């Protein structure tokens, strides 16, 4: 199956290239860029020498429609909203890695992203691509809104609790930490090496744009859901996310009940690994893979549950989940082309 990538020179785009070039059923038909049209991809990323020979092309929707069946959009917020209706009209399946189609309510997007939302007509066609929880909808979709990296790690961690009604809906506190690749390719003072090395930054306190998509899913799972407290931190690693989530339970329980809940919830999900009781994951253990590792604790004294989840923000948080969704669309095993052992070092 032929695929195209729009926004091929960003971090999300280059991770898509790495995965698709090794995929047994998908092949890259074309790579597209806004700013580097005519450049060979190896001039932008020399590590692809003798591996990939594509020249970056301009974005011609009709040509893409003739050459590919699936198109991945690894573009900044706002770009996909303009391009996607044209791509869908050409009969393409679109998987968008930006936030443009994640929110059902356009006013919510405009509030959190500070830009105009996509038209409601195309928003209604989008399926939120949280692979483990939206398989049936993804199979039938023409437009997938790939979840944000923080949202993915958070939702996979909290789903069993919020769906079961075990926790007080207004008690959810999330502490999120991300590697610097999550900030994208464009350098800033905060991501500058001397500023980040041996340091960490808290940012977008109570204002991170992944909050509304998290709350949207929580409400879908549990109509009693309430706004969450969510803080994000930038840490000096290149890739990886750790979510530490706290919530108060409605009635006393034992850790073995929680452990069983998580193990049973995800027993049919090959990319979700539940740590043994008393063990907790770290980002290094999923680096370069599509896994989400989850550990659970329960404090009988405070009656609070703590859930720790880790993902690679470039994989399960972006390109890996996008290809997992493409596999589902294509009727393939969702692990196809994604069974990479974590790098660790």
From Swiss-Prot:
A Pfam family this chain is assigned to: Semialdhyde_dh
GO BP terms, alphabetized: L-arginine biosynthetic process
Family: Belongs to the NAGSA dehydrogenase family. Type 1 subfamily.
NCBIfam families per record: argC
Signal peptide bounds: none
Enzyme Commission designation: 1.2.1.38
Localization of this protein: Cytoplasm
Catalytic class of the enzyme: oxidoreductase
Record's protein name: N-acetyl-gamma-glutamyl-phosphate reductase
Sorted UniProt keywords: Amino-acid biosynthesis, Arginine biosynthesis, Cytoplasm, NADP, Oxidoreductase
PANTHER family membership: N-ACETYL-GAMMA-GLUTAMYL-PHOSPHATE REDUCTASE, CHLOROPLASTIC-RELATED (PTHR32338:SF10), N-ACETYL-GAMMA-GLUTAMYL-PHOSPHATE REDUCTASE, CHLOROPLASTIC-RELATED-RELATED (PTHR32338)
InterPro entries referenced in this protein's UniProt entry, alphabetically: AGPR_AS (IPR023013), AGPR_type-1 (IPR000706), NAD(P)-bd_dom_sf (IPR036291), NAGSA_dehydrogenase (IPR050085), Semialdehyde_DH_NAD-bd (IPR000534)
Chief localisation class: cytoplasm
Role, per record: Catalyzes the NADPH-dependent reduction of N-acetyl-5-glutamyl phosphate to yield N-acetyl-L-glutamate 5-semialdehyde.
GO molecular function terms listed in the Swiss-Prot or TrEMBL record: N-acetyl-gamma-glutamyl-phosphate reductase activity; NAD binding; NADP+ binding
PROSITE patterns: ARGC (PS01224)
Active-site residues, record numbering mapped to chain: 149
Organism: Bacillus cereus (strain B4264)
């Amino acid at each position: 199956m032929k695929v195209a990538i729009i926004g091929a020179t960003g971090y999300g785009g280059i991770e898509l290239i790495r995965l698709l070039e090794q995929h047994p059923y998908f092949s890259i038909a074309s790579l597209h860029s806004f700013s580097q049209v005519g450049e060979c991809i190896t001039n932008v990323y020399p590590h692809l020498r003798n591996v990939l020979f594509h020249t970056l092309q301009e974005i011609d929707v009709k040509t893409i429609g003739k050459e590919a069946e699936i198109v991945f959009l690894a573009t900044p917020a706002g770009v996909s909203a303009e391009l996607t209706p044209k791509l869908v009209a050409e009969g393409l399946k679109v998987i968008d890695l930006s936030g443009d189609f994640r929110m059902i309510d356009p006013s919510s997007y405009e509030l959190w992203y500070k830009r105009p939302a996509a038209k409601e007509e195309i928003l209604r066609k989008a399926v939120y691509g949280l692979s483990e929880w939206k398989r049936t909808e993804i199979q039938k979709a023409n437009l997938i809104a790939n979840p944000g990296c923080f949202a993915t790690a958070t939702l996979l961690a909290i789903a069993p609790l919020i769906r079961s009604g075990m926790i007080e809906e207004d008690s959810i506190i999330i502490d999120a930490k991300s590697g610097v690749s999550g900030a994208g390719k464009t350098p800033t003072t905060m991501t500058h090496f001397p500023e980040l090395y041996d340091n960490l930054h808290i940012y977008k306190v109570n204002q991170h744009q992944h909050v509304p998509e998290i709350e949207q899913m929580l409400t879908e799972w549990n109509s009693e859901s309430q706004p969450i407290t969510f803080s994000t931190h930038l840490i000096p690693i290149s890739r990886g996310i750790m979510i530490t989530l706290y919530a108060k339970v409605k009635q006393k329980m034992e850790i073995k009940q929680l452990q069983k809940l998580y193990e049973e919830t995800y027993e049919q999900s090959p990319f979700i690994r539940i740590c043994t009781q008393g063990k907790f994951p770290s980002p290094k253990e999923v680096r370069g893979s599509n896994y989400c590792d989850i550990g659970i604790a329960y404090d009988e004294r405070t009656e609070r549950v703590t859930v720790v989840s880790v993902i690679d923000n470039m994989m399960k948080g972006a390109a890996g989940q996008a290809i997992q969704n493409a596999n589902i669309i294509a009727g393939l095993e969702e692990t196809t082309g994604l069974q990479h052992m974590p790098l660790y070092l």
